[in-house]
Amino acid sequence: MAQLCVALVAGEASGDILGSGLMRALKARHPDVRFIGVGGPLMEAEGLQSYFPMERLAVMGLVEVLGRLRELLKRRKLLIQTLIEEKPDVFIGIDAPDFTLNIELKLRQAGIKTVHYVSPSVWAWRQKRVLKIREGCDLMLTLLPFEARFYEEQGVPVRFVGHPLADTIPLEADRPAARAALGLGEGPVVALMPGSRGGEVGRLGALFLDAAERLCQQVPGVRFVLPCANATRRAQIEQMLEGRQLPLTLLDGQSHQALAACDAVLIASGTATLEALLYKRPMVVAYRLAPLTFWILKRLVKSPYVSLPNLLAQRELVPELLQDDATSEALANTLAPLVRDGSQQTERFDEIHRTLRRDASNQAAEAVLALLKDR
């Protein structure tokens, strides 16, 4: 079995997790493999020779990107030159599409096989990016089934590999154990998850707390848990709690424990909605953006839904209350019946979980090696 050289580039922590799982699965099938590129500590632990620290690519927000644009473009140009000289058997760009899609295009033009792992949201907005993907990508690996259908329609070779979260989150969470670990009793528990970024928490935090106060009047004995992404978010929430008498427990991280312990969730639109679905917890999804941003996105976004549960179900499975519709009264009134019985949501959640549970890393490794079998 000839040695395989695999180049990978991941730009953030979630990509490092995906990349390390894929590397492990590739080594199990093809032990003589060398890994080069850019990744984090998990990928380096699996044997990646990383050309520079992944943190140099982990930039969020338009202002931050503009501030580092020259460095990012210089690093990408150098990376393309290095990889063309190295001639790996395959290049795998993991998420980070604004950085990796251009690399894939240049390497494919140089005769190197290219794979993109994790689809950008081209099905929702900036759909013309699919033209660049079709030109630069030999294979797209998607985590979600509706993404694969979109690429098939667009003539892009694709494989739906499943979602790693669906592999790691159990089909049935142990609610009593999670409650015991968090010191919660028998009564109804609602998780409040207003997001992990400062702007999100600034727009949704007080709104969620107002809704919780209203919910106390509708659901006797209800308690709340709110997982804080970091110390800064915790301080932000603590400031919002001043003068309130809510039966609320703040958690440091522990979002999965909060989801396992609760009966229902009030949640910001984002990846956390998929986690809530996988824990089979009924939810109400809310989101608020700056008015101008919302106005622009409303005209750009092609999808009728914003939350992953509804995109996966292809219908309004969970209530979405956006912008002016997201009032504390509406949130509490919509959530109260779900605390008592959310089975209409959770039965479909179970079906979706089983669809997504496909052993993603091994599926991805098989797809990559199948692409290379004629090399």
UniProtKB/Swiss-Prot annotation:
EC main group: transferase
UniProt keyword annotations, A-Z: Glycosyltransferase, Lipid A biosynthesis, Lipid biosynthesis, Lipid metabolism, Transferase
Pathway(s) this gene product operates in, as recorded in its UniProt entry: Bacterial outer membrane biogenesis; LPS lipid A biosynthesis
TM spans (from-to): none
GO molecular function: lipid-A-disaccharide synthase activity; phospholipid binding
Catalytic activity: a lipid X + a UDP-2-N,3-O-bis[(3R)-3-hydroxyacyl]-alpha-D-glucosamine = a lipid A disaccharide + UDP + H(+)
Enzyme Commission no: 2.4.1.182
InterPro entries associated with the record: Glyco_trans_19 (IPR003835)
Gene3D superfamilies: Glycogen Phosphorylase B
Pfam families recorded: LpxB
GO biological process, one term: lipid A biosynthetic process
NCBIfam families xrefs: lpxB (TIGR00215)
Family: Belongs to the LpxB family.
Role description: Condensation of UDP-2,3-diacylglucosamine and 2,3-diacylglucosamine-1-phosphate to form lipid A disaccharide, a precursor of lipid A, a phosphorylated glycolipid that anchors the lipopolysaccharide to the outer membrane of the cell.
Protein name, UniProt field: Lipid-A-disaccharide synthase
Taxonomic classification: Bacteria, Pseudomonadati, Pseudomonadota, Gammaproteobacteria, Pseudomonadales
